[in-house]
Amino acid sequence: MIIDVHVHVFEEKMWSKKFLDGVYEVKRKTLTPEQFEKYSLEATPDMLIRDMDAAGVDVSVCLPIDFAFMTRQEPEISIWKANEYVAEAQAKFPDRLIGFVGVDPQRPDAIELLEKGIKDWGLKGVKIFPGMFYPTDERVQHFFRKANEFDLPILFHQGSDPHPFLIKYGNPIYLDELSLKYPNVKAIAAHTARGWNDLLAELMVFRVDKIWTDISGLQYEYTSSKWHFFTNLRYFIDRVPNAILMGSDWPFVKNPPQPSHKEWIQILRDLSLPKVFLDMGMQQFSDEEKNKILGNNAQKLLGL
């Protein structure tokens, strides 16, 4: 079973104007005119299922993103409706899609939305984007106390952040305290906490069955620095082979020069260290290791 633990489904009106303007400004500079003409911040469940079928992905975890409270500009479609949209996607494709609650824990009604999502809509976890707060801040502990009661995975964006968010809040060191303070919280550090990869791996060694990571975003390393891609992935497998989860960050990471969704899955299926790494004494990726990344680890974590 191939499981992608990091995808997003949304309509454009679920993003604030400030966010949309920023995205389109960046894309206008980085995409060709032909690519920009086709670019859209629209990623429906049906579009996702088509890409999953083409790539051979069996199950994807859909993560709502709540930027709006931090940027003080709410989108036309509220975060409540964005979460309900994910719940409806899960209901429409119950064997293919798993929905998480996505909410900024600083919101006054964050716990209300969490309870609605888990109890009434049947969502299976939580997505947190700590772009302007530390997960250990006292003002959000009431949220994590409630989340701890549900005994569900919480996926945290980790590592570098887009403007206007601050990278310091994505340091995985703060997951260490949370993992000890809330014994039922299963923390997933997204993107191998890019920028803090070694620190995250060290934390995971000492917090087995408490902290996991997903490899969404490593597509950038694959295209820009094969050296970093292979050494980073090999290092995590050597240290925490049962805690690495496959992620794609669909639909955000699929435009050239990054591999498409289908190409990314194929890269991981065919994962093979070039000879230069083997000559240095590094171990070749085994079929067992590749299968753990592609889905076996996620299957155990999610109870599938």
Question: For each of these PLM feature ranges, what is it?
Answer:
Residues 2-5, 63, 100-102, 127, ...:
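Active-site neighborhood of phospho(di)ester-bond hydrolases with catalytic His/Asp-centered motifs
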Residues 186, 193-304:
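H/E-rich (His + Asp/Glu) clusters that bind or coordinate divalent metals
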Residues 1-77:
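An N-terminally biased module of ancient metal coordination in phosphate/nucleic-acid-related enzymes
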Residues 63-170, 212-214, 219-221:
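Active-site gating/metal-coordination segments in enzymes
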Residues 6, 52, 86, 99, ...:
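Conserved, mostly hydrophobic/aromatic
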Residues 1, 56-59, 93-98, 120-125, ...:
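Short, well-ordered coil/turn segments that N-cap beta-strands
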Residues 108-118, 137-143, 164-181, 195-206, ...:
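Distinct, well-ordered alpha-helical segments
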Residues 2-12, 154-159, 189-192:
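Histidine-centered catalytic micro-motifs
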